[in-house]
């Protein structure tokens, strides 16, 4: 599975939008930045459709999905953006309220 398969099922989160998480799904995809390696992608099924999260949020869910479900399902998350100087690009993070 690659990231395009994820993008066909889930949308990129809109910055500043509030999403209520109903269910979680964890997928492993080919890493487009590191060929031959894989990365985890967390798909959050929300009240506004499916959105995806990568990096720390997906890694934490991969380590303990039961804990991720306990922390996220039924909660509202807000997507925000920050600039990562090491990667030299904007990344998305989520605030849980």
Predicted regions: what they are:
Residues 1-97:
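Short beta-rich binding modules
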